[in-house]
Amino acid sequence: MPRSPGTRLKPAKYIPVATAAALLVGSSTLFFVFTCPWLTRAVSPAVPVYNGIIFLFVLANFSMATFMDPGVFPRADEDEDKEDDFRAPLYKNVDVRGIQVRMKWCATCHFYRPPRCSHCSVCDNCVEDFDHHCPWVNNCIGRRNYRYFFLFLLSLSAHMVGVVAFGLVYVLNHAEGLGAAHTTITMAVMCVAGLFFIPVIGLTGFHVVLVTRGRTTNEQVTGKFRGGVNPFTRGCCGNVEHVLCSPLAPRYVVEPPRLPLAVSLKPPFLRPELLDRAAPLKVKLSDNGLKAGLGRSKSKGSLDRLDEKPLDLGPPLPPKIEAGTFSSDLQTPRPGSAESALSVQRTSPPTPAMYKFRPAFPTGPKVPFCGPGEQVPGPDSLTLGDDSIRSLDFVSEPSLDLPDYGPGGLHAAYPPSPPLSASDAFSGALRSLSLKASSRRGGDHVALQPLRSEGGPPTPHRSIFAPHALPNRNGSLSYDSLLNPGSPGGHACPAHPAVGMAGYHSPYLHPGATGDPPRPLPRSFSPVLGPRPREPSPVRYDNLSRTIMASIQERKDREERERLLRSQADSLFGDSGVYDAPSSYSLQQASVLSEGPRGPALRYGSRDDLVAGPGFGGARNPALQTSLSSLSSSVSRAPRTSSSSLQADQASSNAPGPRPSSGSHRSPARQGLPSPPGTPHLTILRGPQSCRLHPHGPPRATALADRAEDHPQLKTPPSKLNGQSPGLARLGLATGPPGPSASPTRHTLVKKVSGVGGTTYEISV
């Protein structure tokens, strides 16, 4: 009989079945050996043939009833019906042919037993159409083996009848010699067969009745359907036909195979067509999967197949450039390169997610602010202080397409930016910027080489220090960078041919757009007049999303309204070009004239406008704006006498080389006519390293007015000069009394002022 998994072997269970098998086989064998030969000679040869066929049929049905699955239902898992085990009712009723049949919950198998199913206490299994558990076959009798059990009873009964009948014939013919061996053995077999014939015949008759009624032994004993109608009966003939001729019911429990299956595994990540040509593979199998020690030798055929059908791999990584090669390229700059005038030491700001790479922007000698038409020697001719060397220079949106980068430049590894010290970051907010304290301290001031001014037609110019290139460590894509991108190809500054324009290059331009067409050199124009409107940005807006386009359009509309307000305010409040003290006019003008997003403008103004420009911390640097507010207050309180002018001129005369012209330190958008010597002038060097104020000659008011009349298109509302408001330019270009104030006989006093972000300002008094 098939054992359920986990059950122990019980020898007592096999005693009845072993006894039945021994009696059956032993008695039949003795009958065929001692009785059948005489019956064959005396009666007929058909007697042993008949008994032999019946005996084989008995053995076959006995074996099937013993070893066949009776129809055991599999048990439910422990977690499958855990909740139903506690909350399920004990019985459930179902309709079978219109009759209510009760199903009982099995606490052992964890399911409701189907109709006519019962749990065997010996086998500990629920059996379909359970009849009884027979100890003589050591198996439950159920739906799948009841047929063979019933046939076993019938055949055994017939075999026992034949053994007893033919044995009796033999004994009657040998009555004189009952003591003979053959007669004694025949009488013993007849006793055994006759002894078990009564119960077997009775059991066979009982099951014949059950089969004809369509019942099981369990239903008959428990009294089911005793007083009612059996819903499972099919009639007498139908029931007999169902038991003997119905197809075999399926098996619900399959025992796991005892022999391990040989599974052929193929190594992963190899194409099947390559395996036939490859050498044998050495594969290690472990409990957690496939651990390959794939020592496979590559054959020529497999390599050829790989060439014909390449694997789906990504593009190969470009070769890396050695550090020495990249450093040598930086040390020997090429003309027109964006990094030609920059030092070898590189610092790169954090790269946003949308950028594929970011060119380095090293620290080192910074180029002073100059006009578009001036020529300035290389960085070797500049002498910078320690503060300017330690400071860092970050550009808001660097150019992504440098003109002279190589294939390896795209993947060059840039070192991280060195962190800023706390003294450089917050020194502007912690120090006093009064001129009284600055007069007690001296500092090294930068001596600039003589600059040469060249004339040219007035044309808009994009400087390398445009408003969109303000120092910014975020490197984000701002609206100003979209509307005011730098030269895509890195235009060279006319004043510094070796330095490329470090403006933002739009990532939406196609690769072929390498630069803008060359423009004529602009000539000097009046500082009080604004430049022409800037040319439209080369940004391709068709690649932008609707949200960005809507924000850009809204920004443009707001700029148009601000431009109209500034033009009206400019017509109402005329600029006299004189140095004025803080008054209500200055405050009103600072509040009415809001700063524009771009378009530098240099105008005369009051002291309060000094701190309004974002380049000196206006809107982008509130801490520096506060520092410069105290600076402007100190400047307004300083006595405007000839002594300050003498000291300023002395500082200009003591500088190595001839004194630079007034236009050399102005914004390219606000270049004015050459001013005669002797007029105090404020020179502002815009950059994260230094900002110096030098007095020079006074501008001619009449010439500026004539210049404004000659070029009415240049007269624009006040804007920013390198990120600063018009008030700062007014402070620097305030007119003073000519004559004795231009005497270069006294020494200058220089004040170093540190701002937020590592910006250093040197103010010469």
Curated annotation (Swiss-Prot):
Provide Lumenal-side residue ranges.
Answer: 35-52, 170-190
Which Gene Ontology BP terms does the record give?
Answer: peptidyl-L-cysteine S-palmitoylation; positive regulation of cholesterol efflux
As stated in the Swiss-Prot or TrEMBL entry, residues carrying the post-translational modification Omega-N-methylarginine are R441
Mainly resides where? Golgi
Pfam families reported in the protein's UniProt record: DHHC
What are the annotated GO cellular component locations?
Golgi apparatus; Golgi membrane; mitochondrial membrane
Where is the protein situated, by its record's location annotation? Golgi apparatus membrane; Mitochondrion membrane
Membrane topology term reads: Multi-pass membrane protein
Phosphoserine carried by residues:
S337, S606, S627, S675, S725, S743
Function statement: Palmitoyltransferase that catalyzes the addition of palmitate onto various protein substrates and therefore functions in several unrelated biological processes. Through the palmitoylation of ABCA1 regulates the localization of the transporter to the plasma membrane and thereby regulates its function in cholesterol and phospholipid efflux. Could also pamitoylate the D(2) dopamine receptor DRD2 and regulate its stability and localization to the plasma membrane. Could also play a role in glutamatergic transmission.
Q: Which PANTHER family match?
A: ANKYRIN REPEAT AND LEM DOMAIN-CONTAINING PROTEIN 2, PALMITOYLTRANSFERASE ZDHHC8
Q: From the Swiss-Prot or TrEMBL record, give the protein name.
A: Palmitoyltransferase ZDHHC8
Species of origin = Pan troglodytes
- The gene it comes from is ZDHHC8
